[in-house]
Amino acid sequence: MRKSICWRHLLASFALVSLALTASAIAADKVQLTIDASKAGAKIDRNIFGQFAEHLGHGIYDGIWVGADSPIPDTRGIRNDVVATLKALKVPNVRWPGGCFADEYHWRNGIGRRRNVTLNPNWGGVVEPNTFGTHEFMDFLNQIGAEAYVSVNVGSGTPHEAADWLEYMTAPTTTTLAKERAANGHASPYKIAYLGIGNESWDCGGNMTPDYYVSQMKIYSRFVRNYNPAQQDKDQMLKFAVGPGGAEPRFVDWTEAVMKAYQQHTWSWDINGLSMHSYTVVRWQDKFKSLGFAESEYAQFLKETLTMDGLINRYSAIMDKYDPQKQNARLAAARIGRKRLGQRCNGGLEVSLLKFGEAEVEICSPGNLGLRASAFL
């Protein structure tokens, strides 16, 4: 069963290696690299190629979703070219809804024939039509052959709301919520492989203190249940708590609080991992271009990603202190690239490494196609 996987088992990992050679070294030595494709190498976990979709720029609307009346070729409103690309990449999982949007998302706005039109205050106050909701997301996953990583609203939502959402998605059609799901077009329960308990709760997810988040984490872990009969014994849903957000000292306190709670967990609640986010910042203002950026800018971006190793070691040490046997949780170390290579295509490029839960990479194309990748380490 999945719950037996140890903390240190990385669900996914993006490896970015930067070699800095001085001009004199290049002149003095000739570097030769040989790759023997005939020999088997290390096994790479498929979850490294996971994706992450956020309601930001054209990442969802026009990027994944164009609607049934669009001139762009689509299947039930989902772009065929995006599906073909992600199927070719063999994407294993997609996290949604992501980013600050996740803690202001109310799932009932995105189901049924009549959708509530709201605003997205995190990204310019743009109109959120909610035409891409639960069923559209799950249809998207089915089309590309990926598993669901659902992030529930802890910041402005309630445990009751999150519990209802999971029941709506996963229960057999013996309950009222499951019958509503069936009436909306999907009779069989959905499979939810991963559950995120909030997003960056130390910042836009609610500006919570460590102790307050821990109290919420326990409640959500207890009452947000997966009812899918196929996931009761095997393929059980994994629950990820919000982890640290970089190298600031306050995130040591945060990780200590979450891991101390994990060490003392009882039969009634549990978590399976932490999600660590770290922003690769070259410059917040005057972001680099998505396309046509300079080689020196790309080198700066790669250099910044190397700090992830130190963060993984720092927070792994804290995890080891409270879970020395590495029994039942993993660190999702997410390297989020805020170089903003994707600003020019309304989304940007975000690179995330997740040691214990997810990695995020947003990819932009000239056609305003915005996608993100969410991988597990």
Cite the ranges covered by each PLM segment.
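N-terminal secretory signal peptides that target proteins for export/translocation
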Residues: M1-W7
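Hydrophobic residues within membrane-embedded alpha helices
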Residues: H9-A12, N142
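Bacterial N-terminal signal peptides
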Residues: L11-T22
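Non-catalytic accessory regions flanking glycosidase/transglycosidase catalytic cores in CAZymes
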Residues: A25-G273, E304-G348, K355-L377
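Histidine-centered active-site/metal-ligand motif
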Residues: H277
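Active-site His/acidic residue clusters
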Residues: V281-A299, V351-L353
